[in-house]
Each structure stands twice: as C-alpha cells, then as structure tokens.
Amino acid sequence: DPSKKVERRVRFQATKYVILENELYYRTIDGILLRCLGDDEARSLMGEIHEGVCGAHQSAFKMKWMIRRNGYFWPTILEDCFKYFKGCQGCQKFGNIQRAPASAMNPIIKPWPFRGWAIDLIGQIYPPSSKGHKFILVATDYFTKWVEAIPLKKVTSANMIDFVKEHIIYRFGIPQTITTDQGTMFTSGEFEEFAIGMGIKVLNSSPYYAQANGQAEASNKGIIKLIKRKIEENPKRWHTLLNEALWSYRMACHGSTKVSPYQLVYGHDAVLPWEVKAGSRRLSFQDQLTSDGYA
C-alpha cells in the first residue's frame, strides 16, 4: 500500500515488479518482463533445464542464463543453480577434471553461417550400439557452432560423402571449406573428386597434431559427455539418444558466442518443454493471436 510508510529500499524494489493477469512479473533494466516463480516451480525448472529431455548439464551460470533467457525469475537464481549443479550426480561422475589452469581458446571464425565446417569421427566406441554402430560422425559449423551427427557401423568414403550431402549441403548449402583430419576416408580420391565437383576446399589438420581441428574436438567432447549422462543405465542404446543429445547441445548457451546455436541459426529461441509446462509471456501472447494477427 503506497499510503503506508514503507522503507525506501522496499519501495524501490517494488517498482521492479508488475502484476499482469494475476501473475507476478519482474521488470528487467531493459523493460523485459520475467515471470516470477515460487520454490516448487523453480526446483522443477532447474531440473528440466539441467538434466531434462533437452538438458545439457550446464554450469550454474549457464543455467541462470537459460532461465532468464526463457522468461523466468526469482531472487536467488544463481545461488540455487549452484546448489543444484553441485548436487548433480551426473556432473560429478562425468564432469571435466581440470589438470591445468584454463586458458582462452582462439576459435576459427567464418564471416558467415555454414561457410566452414569441421568434421571428425568419434570411435571406435565400446560397447557398440545394439544395432552394431561403432562410430559417430560429427560436423560443426564454425560460425554458429551448430552440430550435425550420425551413428555409423563402418567408415567409408561413401558414408562421408552421403553425410556431407544430406546433413550439410541439402540443409545449409555448399560450404566454402571443410576441415578434417588425415583419415583415409577424407583423403581418398572418391571424396576429393566429390569436393572438387562441389567447389569445396578440404583442409586437413596434421596427423601429428589432430587438435588443430579444435572446433571438431570441442564438439566431440560435448556430444560424448551428453551421451554418457543419458545412457548410463543402458550403454548399448546410445544410438537412439544421439538426436536427443544433439538437441541439448543446440539449445545450450555456447561459451564463445554467449548464445545457443539454435538462436544464431533461426534468430529466435525454441519453445522447450519447461516453457510449455511453466507457461510464459510469449506463449500466452501467441495463444491469443488470431489468423489476422499472424499475417
């Protein structure tokens, strides 16, 4: 009640909140409204974001970014995210062990999306999947960090060509460059002829320093960690969860771009399970639109 004597600090904090349709919202410094969540909703949201169907087991800071990015708020977000992250058994079991001080990476940057891709092979994987897959072929776009990947039973030049055509060219256009290691499937005459015919320049990293293809190496680590966390109880079904792992990777905040690959590719945020469950301002607005409003 404004007529009552209230401490100045409380009055100031109250100006940051607004009630719309019986829902409490927090107004950011940019004027964006974030729906305020109670304790139960906050715990449920953290669980979905961290380890749900499209959760990528991200750090506390990235969890906070995802929560606010998707339109939610409560006063102790970061503190609660740290508690949840530190209590996650999957993160404790499969998280990185830092043996040396972290140093800044210098990623290759292309001036346009999908003009340069890094391709690498994960495997041989043990145990193989229940369908006999032993490898994962991974491609990462240098600009957006978008990742494409498929499981493979065997590695051939024909498989590489089909992958480039179906998962890169047919979806994103012909790239300028593809960076690979010195694997025979990439250096074969068949693959070289295909690349020349498409006008693609194939760059090979040194066999003595495969880490030169750093973008592919980084993507591989991320995909492997996601798969391990999702298939702990049944390792032989990893091929069925690869697309789920890719979804998690594409929706996660990337360290170098500070946004998700999905947002860079499509220009907006995807509607994810937690937003459907908790509800959001944008979904409410979309539900009220008529066919004329969409025009």
What are the functions of these language-model segments?
Residues 1-131, 138-144, 150, 249, ...:
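RNase H-like DDE catalytic core and adjacent DNA/metal-binding regions
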Residues 45-48, 121, 135, 159-164, ...:
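Well-ordered alpha-helical segments embedded in enzymatic catalytic cores
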Residues 56, 88, 116, 146, ...:
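Domain-scale segment recognizer with a strong primary affinity
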Residues 62-73, 180-184, 208-211:
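Conserved short loop/turn motifs at secondary-structure junctions
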Residues 125-128, 151-156, 211, 233-237:
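Short, contiguous acidic/charged loop-to-helix segments that flank catalytic cores in large enzymes
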Residues 129-133, 258-259:
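Short glycine/proline-enriched turns and hinge-like loops at secondary-structure junctions
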Residues 149-170:
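Active-site beta-loop-alpha junctions of metal-dependent nucleic acid enzymes
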Residues 151, 177-181:
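Short catalytic-loop micro-motif centered on adjacent basic/acidic residues
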